[in-house]
Regions:
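Generic structural signal of hydrophobic/aromatic residues within well-ordered alpha-helices
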Residues: 9, 63, 79-82, 101-112, ...
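Short, Φ-rich (hydrophobic/aromatic) sequence segments
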Residues: 1, 57-65, 259-263
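C-terminal cap/substrate-recognition subdomain and adjoining C-terminal extension
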Residues: 2, 151-171, 178-298
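Alpha-helical substrate-recognition element adjacent to the catalytic core
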Residues: 15-17, 27-181
Length: 298
C-alpha cells in the first residue's frame, strides 16, 4: 500500500508554475492540543501503567510534542524521545516505575522510512516482537480515540481564504505525518479536501520525501513553498531547497492573516526569499526551545 501511495506522489504533474505544501495538525486545524492532551498522552499512561508518574508523563510528552523544537514529530520518534526524557527525570527514577528503553522501536526506526501503522503491522507480523506489538496496540488505540474525540475542530481564521487565493496560481499538497485516514476525514469534514491536489500522510513517507516526490525537479526551487508550524516542516523545506513560511504556535491566526495579506503575494512576485523569509524563520526559532523547563529549574 505504501509503495502505491508513494508512486501517486511521484506521478503528480504540475498544473501551475508554483507549488505549496501545507502541514495539517496545528497548522491548518486547531487539533494539535486536543489530540495530544486528550488522545496520545492518556493512552500512553494507560498502556504502560504509568499512573504513578502521570503528571511527569503529561509534562514530558507535552514538551516533546507541543512546546519544543520537536513539535510535530512523527508519533513513534516522539514516543521514544518522551520515554528517554522520562528516564532522565529524578522524580521518575525515585518512583520505581520502569520506563522501557524501547530498543526494538529504535531499531525499527533506523530501518524504516515510512513510520506508520501499516509498516509497523508488517514488522510485528514478521518478527513477533512483543515490544513492537505493544507500541502498535498503543498507536491503533490512539487512532480510535482521535476518531471518537476530535470532531468539529475548525481551521484557523484566514486558512480557507489563503488556500483559495493560493490555489489560483499554485498546486497545493497536504504534507503531514498524521495517518492518512484521519487527514482525509478531517479535510473532508470541513469541505476543504477539494482545495488541494492530494493529501499525503505518514504512510507516504517523511515530509522531506513528500516534497521530494511531489515537487523537486518539477518546479523552480524558488517556486516551491512549505507552510508549517514545526521545525520538521522547516527541515523538510530546507532539504529540498524550498522556501518556508512558519505558522507560529500560539499566533496561528496572525500568521495566516500575514500570509494571506503579504506572504503569498511575495511568494508569487519572487520577493519572498532573502530578508523577508529570514525574519519569519528567526521569529519562529525563538518560539520553540530545545531544553525542557524542568532541566532549567533543576
Amino acid at each position: 500500500m505504501s509503495h502505491d501511495l508513494v508512486e501517486r506522489l511521484r506521478a503528480l504533474q504540475p498544473k501551475s508554475k508554483f507549488f505549496i505544501g501545507i502541514d495539517s495538525d496545528g497548522c491548518v486545524f486547531d487539533t494539535m492540543e486536543i489530540k495530544q492532551k486528550q488522545c496520545f498522552h492518556p493512552v500512553i499512561i494507560r498502556h504502560w501503567n504509568f499512573e504513578a508518574i502521570a503528571p511527569y508523563v503529561r509534562e514530558t510528552a507535552q514538551f516533546v510534542n507541543l512546546y519544543s523544537r520537536w513539535r510535530g514529530t512523527n508519533r513513534f520518534p516522539a514516543l521514544d524521545m518522551t520515554f528517554d526524557l522520562l528516564r532522565q527525570r529524578p522524580e521518575v527514577q525515585q518512583s520505581g516505575v520502569d520506563v522501557p528503553e524501547l530498543t526494538s522501536l529504535k531499531r525499527w526506526m533506523r530501518e524504516e522510512s515510512r513510520l506508520g501503522n501499516p509498516a509497523l503491522e508488517a514488522k510485528v507480523k514478521e518478527s513477533g516482537d512483543p515490544e513492537l506489538e505493544k507500541i502498535l496496540e498503543w498507536s491503533l488505540e490512539v487512532n480510535r480515540t482521535i476518531e471518537e474525540v476530535v470532531h468539529g475542530v475548525e481551521s484557523f481564521d484566514f486558512v480557507r481564504e489563503s488556500l483559495n487565493k493560493a490555489g489560483q496560481r499554485a498546486d497545493l499538497l497536504v504534507v503531514s505525518q498524521t495517518p492518512l485516514e484521519a487527514l482525509e476525514r478531517e479535510w473532508k469534514e470541513h469541505a476543504m479536501d477539494g482545495l488541494v491536489a492530494m493529501i499525503a500522510g505518514q504512510e507516504h513517507g517523511t515530509k522531506t520525501e513528500h516534497l521530494e516526490y511531489a515537487a523537486s525537479g518539477k518546479y523552480a526551487k524558488d517556486h516551491i513553498l512549505m507552510i508549517g508550524d514545526a521545525p520538521g516542516d522547516l527541515k523538510a523545506a530546507q532539504a529540498n531547497d524550498a522556501l518556508f513560511y512558519p505558522v507560529l504556535p500560539g499566533e496561528e491566526t496572525r500568521s495566516w492573516e500575514k500570509f494571506y495579506r503579504e506572504g503569498l503575494d511575495r511568494f508569487f512576485e519572487g520577493t519572498y526569499a532573502g530578508a523577508y523569509q529570514e525574519e519569519r524563520i528567526e521569529e519562529f526559532d525563538r518560539r520553540l526551545p530545545s531544553v525542557p523547563p524542568w532541566s532549567k529549574s533543576s
